[in-house]
A protein has these predicted regions:
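N-terminal export signals
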Residues: 5-24
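Metal-centered catalytic cores of metalloenzymes
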Residues: 23-221
């Protein structure tokens, strides 16, 4: 009798664990869908106003495709309270421009993600970069994931709050993909070291460590 009771308990526990896991999966998917939908809604609203995310950060200024020209301000937007910084510029082939996101910490600052846009302001790719690109301080995989997961800035620091909300929704919605990017970044660094016997941080032939393409259908636009 005791054995039967114990086996029943195990079966119940397994079923309960499965249900909890399934509910967590559904919650994560619904959270993802909402965040990406919110990002898409920002884009759709801007389209109706004949604007886009790029026009929000340019604020009527002429866009100069130059690595040294940053928008919306010369030093971008820096939230000293949270330690995060964002700026937009353009200079790479295959895109119109991109946002850089950074975290400032006791060791210095570290680049988190590059978010590439096409000319219409639609997001097309997210990437992690080699150190020489932004001359930053290396953080390990777990530190990168933690810094990304805590991304938060004061929307009032942006000339138009919608540009911040768009970035925030996008980063939240693609959490699974971004964490994978961070892991692939680690693998790329290890692979380079195994092959070349040195770190890749100063190798200017290696710019992007990991990336994934964004499908605007995810955003409902």
């Amino acid at each position: 009798m005791k054995r039967r009771t114990f086996l029943s308990f195990l079966a119940y526990s397994a079923t309960f664990t499965h249900l909890i896991g399934k509910q967590a999966y559904i919650f994560q998917n619904s959270e993802r869908a909402k965040a990406l939908s919110d990002a898409g809604n920002v884009l759709l609203l801007l389209q109706k106003q004949k604007k886009n995310v790029i026009s929000l950060v340019l604020q009527g200024r002429k866009f100069k495709r130059n690595v040294d020209h940053h928008y919306p301000h010369p030093k971008g937007v820096h939230d000293e309270s949270s330690g995060y910084r964002v700026f937009f510029h353009g200079h790479r082939n295959g895109e119109y421009g991109h946002f850089h996101t950074f975290i400032y910490h006791p060791k210095g600052y570290t680049h988190l993600l590059m978010i590439s846009l096409d000319k219409s302001g639609m997001p097309i790719m997210m990437s992690t970069l080699n150190q020489w690109v932004t001359n930053d301080v290396h953080l390990d995989e777990q530190e990168m994931i933690e810094a990304y997961s805590n991304f938060s800035m004061d929307p009032g620091l942006f000339p138009d709050k919608r540009s911040y909300y768009f970035l925030s929704y996008l980063l939240k919605g693609y959490k699974t993909e971004i964490i994978t990017l961070m892991k692939e970044r680690t693998l790329a660094l290890r692979s380079y070291f195994d092959i070349n016997g040195k770190n890749p941080d100063t190798d200017e032939k290696l710019e992007i460590l990991s990336s994934f393409h964004i499908h605007t259908s995810d955003l409902g636009v």
